[in-house]
Amino acid sequence: MRIAIAYPPLPSEKGVPLLSQNRQFQWFSRPTYIFPVVPATAATMMKAAGHDVLWLDGIAEELSVEEFDRRLSEFRPDYVVIETKTPVVKRHWKWLREHKGRHEPNTKYVLVGDHVTALPEETMENSPVDFILTGGDWDFLLKNVVSADGDATKYEPGIWYRSIDGSVENTGRFRLDHDLNSAPWIDRDLCKWKLYAEKNGNFRRTPGTYLMSGRDCWHAKCTFCSWTTLYPVYRTRDPMDVVDEIEHLVKEYGVKEIMDDSGSFPVGKFMDVFCSEMIRRGLNRKVRIDCNMRFGRLSAADYRMMRKAGFRLVLFGVESANQITLDRFVKALKVEDIENGAKWASEAGLDVHLTFMFGHAWEGKDEIANTVALARRMLARGYASTLQCTLTVPYPGTPLFAELKEADGLTTLDWDEYDMRKAVTKTPLASEDEIKRAIRDVYRGFLQPSALMRRLASTRTLFDFSFYYRGVRSLLGHLLDFRGGRKGDCR
């Protein structure tokens, strides 16, 4: 079989779509490309099973629509697999209507991702897609579909498909019972890893790449997170296997920084084994590790161990400085945990990146001011190196979406509008201008004298200078973004 893992170009005046490996979709004015771990694992699985595989990321390769179509047509695929998200799903429906039957009459088209997992019937009705693979283990499901070769009796749970008579069928709710240790290491050459090795705001040192020790978050209860739709169950790889892969990436590809993009990096015994092995092999001196983490679980000693093991950047979701919001989001987090955890991590020598969300339906001026004050205080005290502000987007499939929809708390159900360029959550206690002004105030926190001095004091190498230079460019852009209602992140 001939399998294409494809990201069609999505030309738009809004910018470059940040689609792959992204829990929250954004349009960026400056290109940012994140290595898509599960699609790359799927491609590697297909190649290992003896199939011909085409990795065709028209977004990261910055291909024209014509060039993308030419390459796809020349490959003559049996299956075309496309990852989609809420703000671009209508564009992918249109793409499917235009391309179905164009390349090969028997080509099967497959959609994956959190939106189609939440609303599979919608996409089956609005596009000629042949398969929807629901859940986060769609790489395993793709292998199953291809090996079944049209025999639906062999399909695993979680697959939506069209029967011979055109009717829509499905195999029930997906299960996350696949052994992650059975998945091969990603074939980085097959998946053109260099496309994603430089243009990424997380990396201080390049080339960099991504992997995932777990799928996805050991908390998995935050009501706003779109990936809880994909991964309601948490599993991890063997920590020794993860370290083996890191060693391989360092030796064979010269990788200098690795982002472990598990929703939350595994803690407990996994972290102990991982850190001790990184130190024992001397990898802590050869590569920097970045990861996502949650406040309230690790101690100051844990952060010191991480730093010794080669960790550089730790990303935390704060969302709000108000306990009522943290509780409504089921963050299982106290406000005091935020400042304590960030203090411990930064004192251990880790770079701390914090994410904040604005535009919660139940927050007014005072609550917004609390979050602004916390964010600026974290920068001023050096507890945060970088931060990110986004507008609240309740994605289909999340409890937050269900809650707001039932309460008539959404401004629209037009999925194109769920791209964070403007609010889709009704905020009766604060105007959109007040929310934008608050976000600008947070970003101006980078210009506080104490924050600037800390940046200068930590700039020691050319890597640091380049990293902070990119950050300044982003900061200026985001101050303009929120003046005009656009949004982005700040590194």
Regions found by a protein language model. Give the residues of each.
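Radical SAM [4Fe-4S] cluster-binding motif and immediate context
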Residues: 181, 186-353, 360, 370-373
